């Protein structure tokens, strides 16, 4: 997991060859001005989702993980708190290959991070995360889905 400010995103380009495409997209587009929806940046290898997320309490948020895609999550309006756990420490969970997701509904969060507006969090396959923890009823966020290579 990586937590940093957007101005530093380019420093992480060496972690995945597709990260440079994400960086270039963010430098040429104002994410806050994009309409809700899905944007294919490079086929299914790099996809951006702008979505209206529903705020959850810490007890409502459920851990999830992905095997094929890396999540780069960016709160666009205000900070967002996200629960964390290492997948190696979690019990086996059903996996949907179609949606590339496993849920861990009865597993405890090990830690929390708060991503500020102007920041981002990168979640790799080993990083289970419980997103959308916020006191606000709803908020807008950007999620880049980047294929693991």
Model-assigned labels for residue ranges:
Residues 2-49, 57-65:
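A short, N-terminal "cap"/entry segment at the start of jelly-roll beta-barrel domains
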Residues 46, 53-56, 77-81:
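Short, charged/polar surface micro-motifs in flexible loops or helix N-caps
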Residues 52, 125-127, 133, 144-148:
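Short, structured patches in soluble enzyme cores that scaffold and shape functional sites
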Residues 64-66, 136-138:
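A generic structural micro-feature
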Residues 68-70, 74-84, 88-90, 97-103:
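Glycine- and acidic-residue-biased ligand/ion/polar-headgroup-sensing regions
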Residues 72, 120-122, 137-149:
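A short hydrophobic beta-strand segment most commonly corresponding to one strand
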Residues 82-83, 111-114, 128-135:
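Short beta-strand His + acidic residue motifs that chelate non-heme Fe in jelly-roll/DSBH
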Residues 104, 113-128:
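Conserved metal-binding segment of the jelly-roll/cupin
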